[in-house]
């Protein structure tokens, strides 16, 4: 079977499909469509297929609405489409991925913070040791 992305990307040299957000809506009222598009196309330009929508403005109940066609997203990922960071985060929040991306990010931040604390503690003990030797 021919890889579907190679057939669709023939017009775009060196390109690949990306699942990303396309901006819509009005001034001060953004609305995003989740689309499968070539990475060389403009953000709000032509796309291959719309896969969902995202309304970042909270409604009267304080909810941000997300609609996803998970079957088609699974299809495009199987065809080799890349994901943008915001879409990856939305899919993690919706439970599409087994691990939410912020869990990994928070773990890395905590690991760096602990390493820095250990380094500062070691420097502090070194300076205290040199001060006691001088006195």
UniProtKB/Swiss-Prot annotation:
Superkingdom to which the source organism belongs: Eukaryota
InterPro entries: Ribosomal_bS16, Ribosomal_bS16_dom_sf
Stored SUPFAM superfamilies: Ribosomal protein S16
Keywords from the named record: Mitochondrion, Phosphoprotein, Ribonucleoprotein, Ribosomal protein, Transit peptide
A Pfam family assignment: Ribosomal_S16
GO cellular component, one term: mitochondrial inner membrane
One biological process term in Gene Ontology: mitochondrial translation
Single GO term (MF): structural constituent of ribosome
Residues bearing PTM Phosphothreonine: 130
Targeting presequence: 1-34
Cellular location(s): Mitochondrion
Transit peptide is among the record's keywords: yes
Quaternary structure and interacting proteins, as annotated: Component of the mitochondrial ribosome small subunit (28S) which comprises a 12S rRNA and about 30 distinct proteins.
Sequence similarity: Belongs to the bacterial ribosomal protein bS16 family.
Family matches, as PANTHER family: 30S RIBOSOMAL PROTEIN S16, SMALL RIBOSOMAL SUBUNIT PROTEIN BS16M
Protein name: Small ribosomal subunit protein bS16m
């Amino acid at each position: 079977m021919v890889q579907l992305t190679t057939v669709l990307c023939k017009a775009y040299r060196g390109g690949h499909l990306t699942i990303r957000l396309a901006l819509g809506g009005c001034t001060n009222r953004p609305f995003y469509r989740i689309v499968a598009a070539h990475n060389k196309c403009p953000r709000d330009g032509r796309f291959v297929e719309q896969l969902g929508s995202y309304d970042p403005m909270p409604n009267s109940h304080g909810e941000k609405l997300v609609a996803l066609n998970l079957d088609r997203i699974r299809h495009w990922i199987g065809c080799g489409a890349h994901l943008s960071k915001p879409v990856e985060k939305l899919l993690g929040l919706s439970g599409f991925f087994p691990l939410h991306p912020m869990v990994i990010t928070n773990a890395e931040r905590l690991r760096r913070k602990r390493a820095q604390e250990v380094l500062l503690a070691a420097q502090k003990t070194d300076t205290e040791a040199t001060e006691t030797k001088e006195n």
